[in-house]
């Protein structure tokens, strides 16, 4: 379709390109009706530029639009070339002091916790780095897009409003200056004309609702029949639904559908079909039909191409206006005037109003363009920002109504702009007074919560997804209210007072609808059938919590406002209570001669609600009366006399009784909804305005009434009145065993009631209740949290309530109460309580949950025991109450309280079974302690001549009256002190008696109080000494008893050993043999340990016994026994790679014989080291497979291992494995038990002999191949080559291994082949042996690299599993040839050998520069026995090993010299003196000669020798490890310690001369010709001529990329990253590969790629190209490390970035500055280098099953 249209498009382009912007502008300047001229031009040109075919060409369209449409407008404004005109305007303009940078999605933003007026005040990175705030306590987050930098806004910052860039110069003063003075009259007029026309054009066309025709002045005569089927975005349908629908409707591929869906999601709309009307309408019908089943259908329009064209240009015009006003503030001012100018239709007819009111009808892309324009124009001009704010506030209710009906998120709604006005203090105040904004917002909120019950309270429907969606929208209004209140007024005008109080009235109306909502009644008999709705009410409460606090803060700032608010709140509360007492029968309660009237009400029978916001608001205001002293200054203005304390306490008391009854198990049948409500009532998010305020309200009530009356009402509400008012109730109950659970219930209720009294008296750390500061309250919270256990900063912050600015106030006080302990490698930094703060611990702290209370008690008692103190936890000394609450303390000494205490102590003394509990007693003791503390405080602060009214000690000393004559409380305490059953409370009772004596002494002789104190102490001391002596005696008895038992046990043990001597003898023998294998240090002299060659140190192989982890049977490892195997994991690896871009095009044809030195991809084998019988493992694996098949039929989930790929978990440690390695004895000692003659050939002789043998082998193979097609000539040619003496090519050695071992050799070989080449298993493939040798070599190289990086010695102590793995792997690789075809292995040897010793048989061998010498060495050494087994000439295998090693070493030295860098070094010596230096120079000269002088001149010999030594070290270390594990020769002690250079020791161990060049000199006869053949290779010449590259040595270590120290640099880098597939769109999930540094767009459809026929995410695809299937990524927006392996495995890992408190911040929720922790990054790097990523993922997925369910392949 496109190709047919191309010529037409081109033709149009040409006709348009002839237009001249200058000419058009000239015509316009002459025109009388500019409006008509411009519209005609647009009508003619726009449809010819935009929407010309099925696919948009944005670049082409924009170029044409600029040239033909926007260019003339720019010429018109400037009346000259805009390239000259605009710079002039820019020059005349005064730069703005506002930054105004609009944030991109994911860009870092910074807020200063010290200076920002509220958390919405943010800086961009550039301004932040140039501001004073970088040294303050700042918070860092990533922007969701939209919003702008507040730098330069003096209202946003308490100090430092400007950064370096936007700073005012000393001469400037901030003043409102008219920006138009910088423009000439003409420019103003022209700009005004063109802005008015273009802004109106854009608004008209974007709000145009007809799909097939244009506005009159834009219509053209001829109209084509070209339409678009335009699909619009909504937030209801998922990506999958849209993709599926499009595939059906417009018959496109999935990939195209994904492209459409991505664009629709990003821009808000996309044409999905282009053609005539009918063709497009057909698609629309299908889309609507397919998406209307469950929800409302997707919005689709069939739109004429010219309408679409004009709308596209409308958006372009708005963007253009935004960019043009950037040249001058004057232009910005003109645009603002145009936008806000009332149109002919009066109210709401300005262009800005029209856009705002049509917001919900516009698509996403259009909205974001005009929002962006508003931000860069109206919000950047302070004068017009105010006018815009007024328009916004006027339309507020309508905008919110539209938003409720809108199906887009708030981020793309115009209502989200509220934050820009409402948080600016002067604007917020102006809107509050002029537009009554507070009332408007609350009324708008109430508009949307229509459902009410009969009492007018909110009633929420069941919380469905739709309900939650709508309710979320409504909550945004609360956020707006919060914004308005966030900055408190510093001065009040009458108008502000009046409007705030009007708002307060509206707020009370809102709270009134919440007072008593969601009432509940106790279920009796059967469980509740349907959980009642509770979430919505609590969500509302949570959202309003800060608003309620802020309203109180506002009230506190002005005395008149506070008094009025208090009156209003009280009036509303009285209204709410009006209906409750009607028709209730009053009842009279009396105890101890006191009586009170109250209503008959049972919490357990009537309705009760946990929502009492009006009562709680009044409690808050009452505290403010005390705190601000208004209550004492203007008592006549307050309605304090009207207060009815019983009314005030009624509802809060019911609420607290409800909690007590729930705890006592009385509401079990009411289900989880009630449990959840109680939880949130106490939770840190809600408690400040719920539970805490209920306590305050009760404290208010108690302080205003007779405490006896209060306690009686309380007993009545707790339903305990009967129990305490009836004598002998306890005795009666204990005798009636049937009522066990009722007794238990009553006990709990008594405990809860006592706890409540403790709280009422003890909780006075609220400024206004007690004489304390706000910081004392926070300190106390922290002390009690840390008395449970040491805590991390984030835990501590979570346990403290936040204010509206997300601040807890913790940082200001934490230093005074806690020490900070820095974190280790994994943990977090911890705060520990300072010892001196422990005395402030209160066991009954009101914010403890039950679990926290018991933990804290245990921790504090343990601490006291450790400090050798008694374990009592007495109540701490408390600050005095404020005068308004002072009478509260009398509750402790009133008659009813003393009666309750006495009764409970009486029960404890008489010990009536279950009618009392220790917990109850503990609380009573605590209350007595509190009363004693209070009296002591009163006495110590007594004023002369002032009568002491608090006389608790006197009252507890008096016995009860007749007829009961009960003992005094004091007497009962003394009795209880000796009760054996109350051991746990003895210390506390002792403390109380001591306290009592001290007070008595103070009262007796107030003049000599110190003496009295001292006497009390002496008494106490003597009793304590007695106690100590008693404890000591008991401890001594226990010690003697322990010793006696131990002696008996050892005697029995000895006796048993004597009886079973033979058994023990055997065990000891086995032990020694086992330890010998473990120790690997047989009795060999250290003098000269040699690992290989004829002089190899002979070590007797100890017997090896191992135990199968599955059947626990022990077995010796022998050649003929059943195979024992290690669980192993084989994986492809690029950890050592120097070129990750290489890929194998066709694995089936690839020849892996020669490994390139860039090690582009190797095969690594790891093992956990656990041993099994091969048959046990097979059985285990079969059962895993069967289980997996059954599981797959049941559930379609992944497991952490992939059975189809042979994976399983080690049965013991659950380590991921995919094969097993057989355990073998050293293969060399088994396979070469042949007589060897003493005189072994030298290198030249050996090379000649091997070359001859190779020729014979090749000849025989050719003969074999040619047998079928033999000709006489061939046969003759073959007979010419004589067979060397002693060589028997027809001999095939017998395989010494048992069938079981042979099977395992094949199993592991096939696994290495399958994984290494990514092919299907085929045990007969000739490449299997190559991959076995390759994985052995690569694994050794990996280990050597790790050891070198960590600067550890090559034979230092290796972890057991690693040691076992390397030993088994090397022995396996050496034995594998026995199960391969002999000719195949011989063929590999011949080819490998030919790469060093040239042969005519092979043409295409790699040059010496393209071979990794260690892989070559391993291949040659391990393939050599296949040739040597047919050699009976007496030449030994050891000799062969040595010659191969020497040959490869020399080749490696030549390789090093050819590729070494030859810069001069400053420390070069003038004349070479050393033997090595002369030798190396001579060798270099030889190379120079053979390369035809292409090799650069040598620097000094010293430099050359030094670089060769350094370069060959990795090869020598790898060789040492290889031969050590191959031949079992222990390592010399020198190689087991670090520090020295091991070069000489390695040479000795490996039978090398320390001067390596001797090798060349000793074998010069053969080496010269070999060197010549190596150097003559054309590739070597190309390299030396600079035509190609080569790897130089030593190869540098691969490390993960360098990360920036400050995390925000990373966020900034990622925010600039555009999704590569979405045309410059910012990526939503930028993810950084830590291996290569690539930034990827993860977790989104746009960047999915196809991998092996499956669609996978960008990260998964990248792991295959970069890490051979394993990857490490950092998800930048989440600050989270992601490990991926294969397509189905992954896990999240702790990131290496920590905040100042040593904690990570995954998800960037806390926003503390993050810095790179090198240790943690090194740990991740080590996991990568050790190939442990897959293992780490396996363990993580086993530990956390939710990880298994994640679709990792889509990341």
Curated annotation (Swiss-Prot):
One Gene Ontology molecular-function label: L-leucine binding
Tissues where the protein occurs: Highly expressed in skeletal muscle. Also expressed in heart, kidney and testis. Expressed in acinar cells of the pancreas. In testes, expressed primarily in spermatocytes. Expressed in cerebellum.
Cross-link Glycyl lysine isopeptide (Lys-Gly) (interchain with G-Cter in ubiquitin) mapped to chain: 94, 158, 165, 248, 255, 470, 488, 568, 779, 789, 1496, 1599, 1689
Zinc finger (UBR-type): 97-168
Cell cycle in keyword set: no
SUPFAM superfamilies: ClpS-like, Winged helix' DNA-binding domain
Pathway: Protein modification; protein ubiquitination
Residue sites binding a peptide per the record: 148, 150, 153
Binding-site list for Zn(2+) 5: 1168, 1170, 1210, 1213
N-acetylalanine modification, residue list: 2
Record keywords, A-Z: Acetylation, Chromosome, Coiled coil, Isopeptide bond, Metal-binding, Nucleus, Phosphoprotein, Transferase, Ubl conjugation, Ubl conjugation pathway, Zinc, Zinc-finger
Recorded coiled-coil stretches: 1019-1054
Binding site for Zn(2+) 2: 112, 115, 133, 136
EC number assigned by the record: 2.3.2.27
CDD domains the record matches: UBR-box_UBR2
Family designation: Belongs to the E3 ubiquitin-protein ligase UBR1-like family.
Quaternary structure and partners: Interacts with UBE2B; promotes the UBE2B-H2A interaction and the ubiquitination of histone H2A by UBE2B and UBR2. Interacts with RECQL4. Interacts with Tex19.1 and Tex19.2; does not lead to Tex19.1 degradation and stabilizes it. Interacts with L1RE1. Interacts with CASP8. Interacts with ATXN3. Interacts with UBE2O.
Protein name stated in the entry: E3 ubiquitin-protein ligase UBR2
UniProt source species: Mus musculus
């Amino acid at each position: 379709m496109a190709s047919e249209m191309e010529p037409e498009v081109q033709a149009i382009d040409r006709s348009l390109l002839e237009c001249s912007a200058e000419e058009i502008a000239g015509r316009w300047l002459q025109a009388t009706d500019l409006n008509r001229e411009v519209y005609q031009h647009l009508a003619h040109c726009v449809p010819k530029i935009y929407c010309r075919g099925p696919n948009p060409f944005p670049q082409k369209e924009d170029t044409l639009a600029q040239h033909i449409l926007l260019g003339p407008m720019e010429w018109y404004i400037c009346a000259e070339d805009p390239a000259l005109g605009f710079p002039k305007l820019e020059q005349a303009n005064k730069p703005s002091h506002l930054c105004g940078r609009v944030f991109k999605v994911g860009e870092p933003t910074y807020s200063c916790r010290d200076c920002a007026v509220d958390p919405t005040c943010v800086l961009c990175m550039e301004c932040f780095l140039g501001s004073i705030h970088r040294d303050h306590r700042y918070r860092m987050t990533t922007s969701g897009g939209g919003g702008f930098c507040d730098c330069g806004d003096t209202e946003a910052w308490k100090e430092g409003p400007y950064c370096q860039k936007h700073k005012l110069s000393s001469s400037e003063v901030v003043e409102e200056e008219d920006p138009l003075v910088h423009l000439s009259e003409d420019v103003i007029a022209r700009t005004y004309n063109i802005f008015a026309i273009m802004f109106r054009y854009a608004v008209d066309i974007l709000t145009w609702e007809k799909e097939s025709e244009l506005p009159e002045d834009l219509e053209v005569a001829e109209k084509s029949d070209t339409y678009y089927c335009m699909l619009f975005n909504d937030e209801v349908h998922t990506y999958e639904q849209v993709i599926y629908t499009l595939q059906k409707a417009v018959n496109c591929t999935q990939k195209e559908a994904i492209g459409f869906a991505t664009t629709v999601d990003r821009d808000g709309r996309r044409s999905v079909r282009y053609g005539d009307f009918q063709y497009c309408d057909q698609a629309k019908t299908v889309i609507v039909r397919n998406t209307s089943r469950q929800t409302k259908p997707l919005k689709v329009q069939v739109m004429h191409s010219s309408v679409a064209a004009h709308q596209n240009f409308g958006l372009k015009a708005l963007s253009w206006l935004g960019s043009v006003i950037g040249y001058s503030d004057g232009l910005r001012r003109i645009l603002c005037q145009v936008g806000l100018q009332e149109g002919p239709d009066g109210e709401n007819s300005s262009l800005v109003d029209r856009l705002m009111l049509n917001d919900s009808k516009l698509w996403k892309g259009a909205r974001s363009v005009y929002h962006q324009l508003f931000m860069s124009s109206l919000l950047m001009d302070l004068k017009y920002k105010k006018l815009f704010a007024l328009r916004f506030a006027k339309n507020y209710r309508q905008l919110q109504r539209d938003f409720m009906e809108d199906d887009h998120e708030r981020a793309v709604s115009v209502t989200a702009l509220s934050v820009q006005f409402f948080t600016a203090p002067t604007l917020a105040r102006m809107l509050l007074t002029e537009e009554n904004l507070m009332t408007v917002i609350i009324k708008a909120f109430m508009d949307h919560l229509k459902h009410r019950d009969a009492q007018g309270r909110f009633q929420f429907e069941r919380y469905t997804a739709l309900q939650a969606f709508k309710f979320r929208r409504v909550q945004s209004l609360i956020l707006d209210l919060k914004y308005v209140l966030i900055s408190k007024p510093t001065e009040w005008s009458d108008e502000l007072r009046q409007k705030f109080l009007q708002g307060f009235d509206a707020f009370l109306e809102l709270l009134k609808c919440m007072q008593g909502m969601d009432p509940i009644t106790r279920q009796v008999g059967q469980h509740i059938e349907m959980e009642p709705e509770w979430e919505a009410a609590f969500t509302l409460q949570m959202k309003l919590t800060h608003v309620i606090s802020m309203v109180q803060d506002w009230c506190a700032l002005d005395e008149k406002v506070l008094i009025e608010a208090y009156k209003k709140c009280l009036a509303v509360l009285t209204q709410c209570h009006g209906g409750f007492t009607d028709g209730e029968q009053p009842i009279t309660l009396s105890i101890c001669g006191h009586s009170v009237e109250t209503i008959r009400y049972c919490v357990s029978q009537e309705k009760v609600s946990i929502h009492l916001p009006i009562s709680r608001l009044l409690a808050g205001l009452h505290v403010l009366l005390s705190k601000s002293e208004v209550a004492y200054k203007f008592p006549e203005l307050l309605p304090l006399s009207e207060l009815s304390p019983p009314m005030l306490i009624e509802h809060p008391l019911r609420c607290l009784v409800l909690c007590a009854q729930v705890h006592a198990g009385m509401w079990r049948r009411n289900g989880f909804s009630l449990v959840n409500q109680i939880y949130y009532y106490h939770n840190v998010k809600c408690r400040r305005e719920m539970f805490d305020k209920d306590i305050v309200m009760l404290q208010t009530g108690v302080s205003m009434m007779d405490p006896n009356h209060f306690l009686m009402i309380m007993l009545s509400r707790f339903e305990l009145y009967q129990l305490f008012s009836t004598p002998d109730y306890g005795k009666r109950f204990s005798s009636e065993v049937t009522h066990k659970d009722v007794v238990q219930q009553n006990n709990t209720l008594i405990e809860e009631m006592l706890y409540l009294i403790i709280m009422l008296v003890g909780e006075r750390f609220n400024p206004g209740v007690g004489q304390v500061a706000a910081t004392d309250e926070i300190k106390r919270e922290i002390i009690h949290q840390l008395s449970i256990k040491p805590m991390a900063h984030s835990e501590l912050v979570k346990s403290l309530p936040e204010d509206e600015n997300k601040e807890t106030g913790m940082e200001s006080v934490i230093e005074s109460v806690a020490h900070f302990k820095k974190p280790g490698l994994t943990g977090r930094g911890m705060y520990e309580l300072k010892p001196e703060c422990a005395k402030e611990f209160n066991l009954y702290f009101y914010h403890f949950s039950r679990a926290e209370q018991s933990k804290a008690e245990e921790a504090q008692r343990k601490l006291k025991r450790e400090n050798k103190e008694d374990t009592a936890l007495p109540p701490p000394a408390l600050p005095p109450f404020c005068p308004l609450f002072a009478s509260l303390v009398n509750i402790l000494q009133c008659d009813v309280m003393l009666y309750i205490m006495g009764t409970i102590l009486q029960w404890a003394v008489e010990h009536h079974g279950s009618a009392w509990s220790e917990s109850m007693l503990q609380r009573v003791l605590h209350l007595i302690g509190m009363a004693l503390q209070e009296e002591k405080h009163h006495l110590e602060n007594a004023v002369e001549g002032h009568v002491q009214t608090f006389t608790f000690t006197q009252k507890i000393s008096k016995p009860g009256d007749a007829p009961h004559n009960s003992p005094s409380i004091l007497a009962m305490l003394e009795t209880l002190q000796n009760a054996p059953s109350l051991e746990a409370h003895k210390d506390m009772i002792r403390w109380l008696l001591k306290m009592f004596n001290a007070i008595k002494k103070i009262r007796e002789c107030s003049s000599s109080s110190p003496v009295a104190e001292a006497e009390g102490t002496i008494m106490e001391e003597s009793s304590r000494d007695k106690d100590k002596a008693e404890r000591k005696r008991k401890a001594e008895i226990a010690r003697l008893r322990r010793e006696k038992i131990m002696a008996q046990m050892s005697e029995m043990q000895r006796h048993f050993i004597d009886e079973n001597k033979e058994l023990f003898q055997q065990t000891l023998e086995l032990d020694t043999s086992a330890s010998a294998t473990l120790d690997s240090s047989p009795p060999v002299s250290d003098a000269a340990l040699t690992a290989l060659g004829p002089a190899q140190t002979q070590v007797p192989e100890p017997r090896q016994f191992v135990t199968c982890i599955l059947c626990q049977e022990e077995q010796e490892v022998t050649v003929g026994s059943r195979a024992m195997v290690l669980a192993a994991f084989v994986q492809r690896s690029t950890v050592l790679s120097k070129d990750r871009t290489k890929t194998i095009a066709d694995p089936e044809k690839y020849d892996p014989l020669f490994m390139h030195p860039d090690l582009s991809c190797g095969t690594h084998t790891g093992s956990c080291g656990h041993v099994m019988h091969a048959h046990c493992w097979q059985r285990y694996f079969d059962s895993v497979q069967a289980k997996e098949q059954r599981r797959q039929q049941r559930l379609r989930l992944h497991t952490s291992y992939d059975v189809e790929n042979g994976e399983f978990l080690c049965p013991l440690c659950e380590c991921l494995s995919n094969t097993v390695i057989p355990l073998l004895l050293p293969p060399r000692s088994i396979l070469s038990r042949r007589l060897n003659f003493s005189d072994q050939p030298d290198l030249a002789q050996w090379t000649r002999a091997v070359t001859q043998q190779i020729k014979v082998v090749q000849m025989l193979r050719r003969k074999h191949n040619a047998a079928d097609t033999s000709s006489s000539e061939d046969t003759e040619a073959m007979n010419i080559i004589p067979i060397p003496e002693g060589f028997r090519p027809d001999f095939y050695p017998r395989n010494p291994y048992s069938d079981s071992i042979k099977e395992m050799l094949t199993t592991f070989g096939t696994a290495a082949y399958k994984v290494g080449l990514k092919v299907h298993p085929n045990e007969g493939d000739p490449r299997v042996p190559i991959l076995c040798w390759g994985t052995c070599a690569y694994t050794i190289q990996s280990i050597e690299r790790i050891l070198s990086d960590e600067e550890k010695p090559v034979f230092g102590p290796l972890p057991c599993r690693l040691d076992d793995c390397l030993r088994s792997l090397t022995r396996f690789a050496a034995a594998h040839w026995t199960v391969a075809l002999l000719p195949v292995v011989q063929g590999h040897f011949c080819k490998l050998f030919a790469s060093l010793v040239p042969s005519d048989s092979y043409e295409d061998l790699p040059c010496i520069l393209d071979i990794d010498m260690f892989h070559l060495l391993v291949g040659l050494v391990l393939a050599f026995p296949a040739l040597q087994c047919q050699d009976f000439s007496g030449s030994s295998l050891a000799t062969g090993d040595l010659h191969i090693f020497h040959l490869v070493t020399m080749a490696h030295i030549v390789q090093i010299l050819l590729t070494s860098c030859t810069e001069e070094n400053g420390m070069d010596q003038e004349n070479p003196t050393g033997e090595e230096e002369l030798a190396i120079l001579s060798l270099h000269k030889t190379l120079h000669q053979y390369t035809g002088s292409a090799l650069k001149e040598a620097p000094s010999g010293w430099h050359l020798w030094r670089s060769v030594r350094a370069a060959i070290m990795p090869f020598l270390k790898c060789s040492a490890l290889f031969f050590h594990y191959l031949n079992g020769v222990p390592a010399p002690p020198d190689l087991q310690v670090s520090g020295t250079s091991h070069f000489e020791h390695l040479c000795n161990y490996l039978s090398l001369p320390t001067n390596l060049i001797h090798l060349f000199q000793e074998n010069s006869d053969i080496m010269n010709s070999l060197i010549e053949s190596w150097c003559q290779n054309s590739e070597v010449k190309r390299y030396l001529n600079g035509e190609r590259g080569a790897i130089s040595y030593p190869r540098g270590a691969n490390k993960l990329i360098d990360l920036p120290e400050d995390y925000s640099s990373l966020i900034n880098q990622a925010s600039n990253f555009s999704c590569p597939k979405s045309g410059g769109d910012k990526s939503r999930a930028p993810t950084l590969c830590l291996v290569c540094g690539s930034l990827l767009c993860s977790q989104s459809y746009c960047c999915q790629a196809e991998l092996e026929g499956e669609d996978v995410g960008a990260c998964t695809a990248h792991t295959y190209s970069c890490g051979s299937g394993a990857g490490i990524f950092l998800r930048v927006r989440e600050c989270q490390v992601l490990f991926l392996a294969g397509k189905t495995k992954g896990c999240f890992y702790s990131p290496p970035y920590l905040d100042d408190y040593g904690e990570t911040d995954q998800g960037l929720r806390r926003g503390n500055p993050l810095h790179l922790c090198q240790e943690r990054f090194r740990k991740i790097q080590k996991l990568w280098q050790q190939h442990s990523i897959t293992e780490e993922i396996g363990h993580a997925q086993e530990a956390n099953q939710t990880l298994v369910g994640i679709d990792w392949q889509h990341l």
